[in-house]
Amino acid sequence: MSADVIQSLLELSHQLGGERLRMVILGEGNTSVRLDDDTFAVKASGSNLASLKVSDVTQCAFSRLLPLLDTTAATDVEVDQALLAARVDPASKKPSIEALFHAYLLTLPGVRCVGHVHAIAVNQILCSPRAREFAEKRACPDEIVMCGLESVFVSYAEPGLGLSQAIRREVVSFVKRTGRDPKIILLQNHGIIAVGSSPKAVLGSLLMVEKPPRSLSVPPPWVVRSS
């Protein structure tokens, strides 16, 4: 694995995992970077973003995970076996279960980095009746620049294969409907995914999507339930 690329992944992970940003707690969240046409590096299962080390990053083969997204059904055991088989180094740690959607998102045009967090300010909205409207609206011009005109919205699904398939389905639908590639994907009752050309771009998008709900003392109108 390229030392510089992995170092940039570690730096992003430490920033996202830090207490100041309040984007994750304990083992929440994960990050990944594309290494080349065949492989990517992703946070290992059971590791912590704030303290992520090189040994907590697992290199995986796209070809061993992407076909799983086309299966109509797979048991938890089969998914675990696929995750273990995807490791380039069999001695490395098992990749996160969410490596499945990282593998897909890293194949999108221009995407070389993915960050997934459970930001408290945003999750307050994603766990509300106005979650979908939050994905469709923007509160300030900078949010449009960093996060796009709207976000992909994914209805709640249990983490694992089902969620990864739902993400792919909604991204494909979004691109077809808007003609644009997404920057932010919002997962109902779960969290945020940012995709970008670099760790810096991903960090910027995640900071910006959290800005409106964090800075406004009065929630935007799409958060407040109509009477």
Q: Where are each of the predicted segments found?
A:
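Glycine-rich flexible loops
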Residues: 1-227
